[in-house]
Amino acid sequence: ARSMANTKQVKAANVLNNAFSSSSAGGDGKELCATDHPIVAGTDRNELSTAADLNETSLEQSLIDIAAMTDERGLKIAARGVKMIIPSALQFTAERLMKSSGRTGTADNDINAVVSKGMVPQGYAVNHYLTDTDAFFIKTDVPNGLKHFVRAPMKTAMEGDFTTGNVRYKA
């Protein structure tokens, strides 16, 4: 049973694990995270213009980019970041960024703008199945985002053998 649950988690995480891979193209012919998704009004991007590790600057830029998101016609949709999804390798960085009242990694006495403005209200979640140790994702409040469908739910069965006492199990 644990193996089946693990497989389900791995396959679900693969959506994000392959998000930057051009070999995993979606319906528009682009990877999930791309700088040139084709839309009616031209192209749109859903990743940083320049790839960056998780830090104060990249988190703030991500939230600025999310706030500037537009629909397929180029109209602003006033999106907001809701939760950050990170691999376990970034949990300490995320904790400092999301819980410190002051700016992280600096002696300045500035406030932590992300925290004081409540820009990521649900904080962060660690996904232990993410394989890229420096990739981070931000879930937004935009409806109809990533969805998970179970086309055919897993069925299990057990059968005991009276003669040998063995139990057979299948999924």
Report the location of each language-model feature.
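Structured all-alpha helical bundle cores of eukaryotic regulatory proteins
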Residues: A13-A41
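Long, contiguous amphipathic alpha-helices that act as assembly "spine/axial" helices in icosahedral shell
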Residues: A1-S23, M84, Y169
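Sequence/fold signature of self-assembling virion shell proteins
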Residues: K30-D71, A78-K83, A89-A171
